[in-house]
Amino acid sequence: SSEDRKENIRRIAEVSKLFINCGIVTLNCFISPTIEIREIAKNIIGKKNFIEVYINATIKTCEQRDVKGLYKKARSGEITHFSGISAPFEAPKNPALEINTAKLSIDESTKKVLDYILPTIKMPSI
């Protein structure tokens, strides 16, 4: 449900904040289907430490990559509240970085993310 999704993202953000407060770089990858949910995460983590990376994949691309058959189950009604099928998905309006996975390989996508994120990480002086 929508409330379950919000709670899941809230918990992830709270744990991330604990790691960040300990000086640990934290990368999270999860489905956050609404702008509201992403704002909740950003508010918990803090704008300074929150970098939104939009991994952009069309429904068609997701279905082609779906080895578990979840999209098929969602389309048949076996799975309800499935993002992009029976529940909304709102694309980010202004992500820090967008990766179009239909055009980029896994290696190219990974490089693009790392090239963006690594320069923002401040390592403590030893």
Where are these regions (language model features)?
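Hydrophobic alpha-helical membrane-association signature
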Residues: 8-12, 109
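Small-molecule kinase domains that catalyze NTP-dependent phosphoryl transfer to phosphate-bearing small molecules
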Residues: 56-112, 118-126
